[in-house]
Amino acid sequence: MGLSPGSAKLGSPAQPLIAPAATGILDPRTGRPVGADDRFFVEVNNELSDKGFFVAATDDLITWARTGSLMWMTFGLACCAVEMMQMSMPRYDAERFGFAPRASPRQSDVMIVAGTLTNKMAPALRKVYDQMPEPRYVISMGSCANGGGYYHYSYAVVRGCDRIVPIDIYVPGCPPTAEALLYGVMLLQKKIRRIGTIER
């Protein structure tokens, strides 16, 4: 796309050097709202302009709300709990994904089991799990929680917390990084969107 003799010079008003900036929500190239060609946007816009309200399945609405407001409680048993705490700190900021910590199991949707589960601690894990309201989810974090890890052959260790409570997401690692746990949280949200929340 070179300049031919007689055409506008580079930098002239006919051919600006800087792309025009968007004004509000309008695309400067077309003058239409940004995303106006998106099929979803068109369907929603047509339905809203026709009826004045939006029709959706209640289950879809509940699922959407639940994935954006998961409350988690910590069940930190060993060194993995340090990475779990790091995930909620400002560097990773899990709350921007709608994943906020709670202190009580009665207010929590998700329990993160992080660390080595011993035989003495197993009844406490089950008791805390039973106090959580339905639907409830469990993330098993780290090799020890997943399958006993380094202490697998110890007489005092449960070889995986899935023997005590049902697990939804396994996060591998010894210890897993905060990024890995955050990825596990996003996988849980994806799973909830896929299977719904009314029946589990």
Swiss-Prot record:
UniProt remark on cofactor binding: Binds 1 [4Fe-4S] cluster.
Top enzyme category: translocase
InterPro entries, per database record: NADH_UbQ_OxRdtase-like_20kDa, NADH_UQ_OxRdtase_20Kd_su
Enzyme Commission number(s): 7.1.1.-
GO MF annotation, one: quinone binding
PANTHER family with a match to the protein in the record: NADH DEHYDROGENASE (PTHR11995), NADH DEHYDROGENASE [UBIQUINONE] IRON-SULFUR PROTEIN 7, MITOCHONDRIAL (PTHR11995:SF14)
Its biological purpose: NDH-1 shuttles electrons from NADH, via FMN and iron-sulfur (Fe-S) centers, to quinones in the respiratory chain. The immediate electron acceptor for the enzyme in this species is believed to be ubiquinone. Couples the redox reaction to proton translocation (for every two electrons transferred, four hydrogen ions are translocated across the cytoplasmic membrane), and thus conserves the redox energy in a proton gradient.
Similarity remark: Belongs to the complex I 20 kDa subunit family.
Classification via NCBIfam families: nuoB_fam, PRK06411.1
Protein name per Swiss-Prot or TrEMBL: NADH-quinone oxidoreductase subunit B 2
Organism in which the protein naturally occurs: Rhodopseudomonas palustris (strain BisA53)
